[in-house]
Amino acid sequence: MTLSQQLSTLISKTQLVVSQEQIDLLIQYVELLNKWNKAYNLTSVRDPSEMLVKHIMDSLMVGEVLIGKNFIDVGTGPGLPGIPLAILYPERNFVLLDSLGKRITFLRQVVFQLKLSNVTPVKARVEEYQGEEPFDGVLSRAFSSLNDMVSWCKHLITTEQGRFFALKGQYPQDEISQLPENITLVDSHEIIVPDLVGERHVIVLKKLH
């Protein structure tokens, strides 16, 4: 099976609506990631078929819980979950933030080749970055704890509607119980990723103003 056929099969196991054009873009992204990974070491996942499950599907399944139009993906690495989500939701805007130059160089190439007008890669440390507009959501699968995420990113959420969307494995009960008093749990969603072994959750948090 081609990568495109593999991805189509994975998507068919979900409720996602993805066009052939979007599948083509997602495959182009995987091919670029696989090519650049050999020199830049952007991900520990080496097999493109495995990338479809662990990177593409894992990112796409987050989309159904997002609310809003403007998002920032903090510690995006090679563009995860930001690039797959930007392909799936062209009407939404994504800032992809990372402090490592080689990752941003790669992401600029992805944006150029895939003509993604709704993606802005930014090289910066999160604590030093100020967005031009308020974000509806801060996304991340990079932080080791929820406390770290809200501590480092709290200045990026400035509106009542703003939310933190944290991608985690098992339900992080201990981390939730250790959150500061001004951060509240809005929701948690168990995400079923086709062919992925292990639990996945999206934890939705907000600041109490």
Curated annotation (Swiss-Prot):
Its main location: cytoplasm. The keyword Zinc-finger does not apply. It is an enzyme of class 2 (transferase). The keyword Electron transport does not apply. InterPro entries: rRNA_ssu_MeTfrase_G (IPR003682), SAM-dependent_MTases_sf (IPR029063). GO terms for cellular component: cytosol. It is found in: Cytoplasm. Keywords: Cytoplasm, Methyltransferase, rRNA processing, S-adenosyl-L-methionine, Transferase. It comes from the Bacteria. One of its GO terms (molecular function) is rRNA (guanine-N7-)-methyltransferase activity. It catalyses: guanosine(527) in 16S rRNA + S-adenosyl-L-methionine = N(7)-methylguanosine(527) in 16S rRNA + S-adenosyl-L-homocysteine. S-adenosyl-L-methionine binds at residues 75, 80, 126-127, 141. Specifically methylates the N7 position of guanine in position 527 of 16S rRNA. Belongs to the methyltransferase superfamily. RNA methyltransferase RsmG family. This is Ribosomal RNA small subunit methyltransferase G. It comes from Colwellia psychrerythraea (strain 34H / ATCC BAA-681). The gene is rsmG.
